[in-house]
Regions:
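Short loop/turn segments immediately following the C-termini of beta-strands
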Residues: 124
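Active-site-proximal alpha-helix that buttresses catalytic centers in soluble enzyme cores
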Residues: 1-116, 127-184
Length: 184
């Protein structure tokens, strides 16, 4: 049974109102990809979730046993969630599960609940609210808005003894210079 679920928003994306573009791993423009800053976050998340020293920045964090990200589809071709955590998966020698796409949050949660240990999920921020509400069983135990400008949070859900269910915690990542120390 899953004991901890950590959820991050995909890394920074291209800004429609500026000259910042999405780029693929080879540096070619791709609007469905991370921005250069998103790629920086992706790289920093490797040691955030797999610290070389074995010491996490918070006791609420743990090394993932399984990693899920929103898979690209015809309706949502974005590769941002995948590329945000691909490096983490590679560093831990884990398969990155891309089976579910945006809009399939219920199927994602159903599968995550069958996984043992610790799960990391990277997803689109508005749909993260749906994922957390499905896990918690209500919309009162967690924030119901994730600002468009925030890419620097981790939401952690820890399984509690029955009948308590889940404990919700938020953590700032504090990985890049502009990251906020404040949670929602």
């Amino acid at each position: 049974m899953v004991k901890k679920i950590m959820i991050v928003r995909h890394g920074e994306k291209p800004d429609r109102d500026s000259e910042i573009h999405g780029v693929d791993a080879s540096g070619e423009h791709d609007r469905n990809e991370l921005s250069p800053q998103g790629w920086q976050r992706s790289g920093a998340l490797i040691r955030f979730f797999n610290p070389a020293s074995g010491q996490f920045s918070s006791p609420a964090l743990a090394k993932p046993d399984a990693i899920f990200a929103a898979g690209p589809s015809g309706d949502t071709p974005s590769l941002r969630s995948k590329n945000t955590v691909q490096g983490v998966a590679d560093s831990l020698r884990l398969h990155l599960n891309l089976r579910h796409t945006k809009g399939e949050e219920k199927k994602l949660v159903d599968e995550v609940m069958t996984v043992g240990g610790v799960v990391l999920i990277a997803w689109e921020h508005k749909a993260i609210l749906d994922i957390v509400n499905l896990i918690l069983g209500n919309a009162r135990s967690s924030p119901q808005h994730w600002p468009d400008s925030r890419f620097d949070l981790v939401w952690v859900l820890d399984a509690q003894p029955h009948p308590a269910g889940w404990k919700f915690t938020q953590l700032p990542q504090l990985l890049l210079p502009h990251d906020s120390p404040h949670v929602l």
